[in-house]
């Protein structure tokens, strides 16, 4: 999906894109239209099974990353734990609610349901306030 959405920018601004983005677009462009359609269908079916969670809960908590935030400002760390939620099209937000080694933040990720951003952000605000106390 990334390749499909960013190929125009790749053609015009390739040198301005990070190596990661360039590689991801090149890799994505190797898939056929049929493979892309199958992936979109799989994503829709995956979301349908995930959506059942929100019949009983307002959000899902998970780690934001495998560890604490990296030192400095060069990187925000890995986005591996966020990819599945982006793939499903669900909102997710990382909140620095915990503290790890060297007083670096350890993020907790809150995941919400599609098209329910107002409630999702309210739950995020509530969670942040509860953890401050």
Regions found by a protein language model. Give the residues of each.
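Short helix-loop capping/hinge segments that flank enzyme active sites or metal/cofactor-binding pockets
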Residues: 1-47, 51, 96-107
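Small-aliphatic-rich amphipathic alpha-helix that forms the alpha element of a beta-alpha
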Residues: 49-51, 76-96
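Short low-complexity, flexible loop/linker segments enriched in glycine and/or proline
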Residues: 1, 77-78, 108-111
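Amphipathic alpha-helical segments in well-structured domains
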Residues: 3, 78-81, 124
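Structural helix-boundary/capping segments
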Residues: 37-41, 87-133
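Short, surface-exposed loop/helix-turn segments at secondary-structure junctions
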Residues: 38, 65-84
């Amino acid at each position: 999906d990334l390749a499909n959405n960013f190929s125009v920018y790749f053609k015009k601004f390739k040198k301005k894109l990070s190596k990661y983005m360039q590689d991801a677009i090149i890799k994505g462009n190797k898939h056929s239209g049929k493979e892309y359609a199958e992936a979109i269908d799989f994503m829709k079916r995956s979301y349908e099974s995930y959506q059942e969670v929100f019949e009983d809960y307002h959000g899902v908590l998970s780690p934001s990353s495998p560890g604490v935030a990296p030192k400095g400002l060069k990187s925000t760390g890995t986005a591996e734990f966020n990819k599945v939620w982006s793939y499903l099209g669900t909102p997710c937000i990382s909140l620095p609610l915990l503290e790890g080694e060297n007083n670096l933040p350890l993020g907790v990720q809150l995941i919400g349901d599609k098209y329910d951003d107002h409630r999702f952000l309210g739950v995020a605000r509530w969670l942040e306030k509860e953890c401050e106390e």
